[in-house]
Design a protein with these regions (language model features):
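Asp-based, Mg2+/Mn2+-dependent phosphohydrolase catalytic module
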Residues: 1-7, 20, 118-121, 130, ...
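Short, surface-exposed acidic
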Residues: 34-46, 81-96, 150
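Active-site neighborhood of HAD-like aspartate-dependent phosphohydrolases
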Residues: 1-9, 14-51
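Alpha-helix N-cap/helix-initiation sites
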Residues: 19-23, 39-42, 64-68, 85-92, ...
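Short, acidic loop-to-helix structural element flanking the phosphoryl-transfer center
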Residues: 8, 68-72, 87-129
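A metal-dependent, Asp-based hydrolase signature
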Residues: 51-98
Length: 234
């Protein structure tokens, strides 16, 4: 008898290649808005955006800032640096809407994502997506990437009213899925939000470490460096 019946699976950069897809979308945004007027090239704009975005998402996951602040600020900062003039909130929202429209059409997945999900489905696991991503974008990304139909349940932080790694997020996920703590495994690439959140809640964890030169800072149940390695565990 298998140890787990339910899998909580992170989406962004665990299955969906958010980093790669965002790079493509930001280059398209750069061209559409003619940002070469303020940046030497698209890579400079991309680097400015990504550094800001990582910082803001970390703070958002900790509940320190709101969704609306993140959406505006992640474009206000890089555009301010490039233009030397701070854009107003309306302009930042327009840029954000265009970026999210571009991103949500991208279909790139992490290597081995479809093979893994096909395998897990064949083994009879119940699969539940657990994500801090925004509601209106995640469903479009799920469909663009061909991953939507694999999931039994979609758990989003906006529906839960709180973000991973909060215990309240996992309370909500357990209620929605009717999963049991001892038979549920959390799979994710973000050690702080996915792995520590689930571990502190009492769930087993599988850390997808995409950068193996930086091993897990504390013990986990499983650590893999590719999605295909999860097939050997499950």
């Amino acid at each position: 008898m298998k140890q787990y019946t339910d899998l909580f699976i992170d989406f962004d950069d665990t299955l969906y290649d958010t980093y790669g897809n965002a790079e493509i979308a930001l280059h398209e945004l750069f061209d559409a808005l003619h940002l070469e007027r303020w940046f030497p090239d698209a890579s400079v704009f991309y680097d400015e955006y990504w550094q800001t975005n990582i910082d803001l998402w970390t703070r958002y996951s900790r509940g320190e800032i709101t969704r609306d602040y993140l959406i505006v600020e992640r474009f206000r900062r890089p555009l301010s640096k490039g233009q030397g003039l701070e854009p107003d909130e309306k302009r930042c929202l327009e840029v954000s809407d265009l970026f999210l429209d571009l991103l949500s059409t991208k279909s790139g997945v992490v290597e081995g994502a479809h093979e893994l999900m096909d395998y897990l489905r064949s083994q009879g696991y119940r699969m539940h997506m657990c994500s801090n991503g925004f509601h209106e974008v995640q469903y479009r990304k799920l469909r663009s990437s061909g991953l939507y139909d694999y999931f039994d349940t979609i758990i989003l932080s906006e529906d839960a009213g709180t973000n991973k790694p909060s215990a309240r997020f996992f309370d909500y996920a357990m209620q929605q899925t009717r999963a049991g703590k001892t038979t549920t495994l959390m799979i994710g690439d973000n050690f702080q939000t996915d792995i520590l959140g689930a571990k502190h809640y009492g769930l087993a964890t599988a850390y997808f470490n995409r950068y193996p030169q930086y091993p897990a800072p504390e013990p986990v149940d499983y650590e893999v460096t590719s999605l295909r390695q999860l097939m050997d565990i499950l």
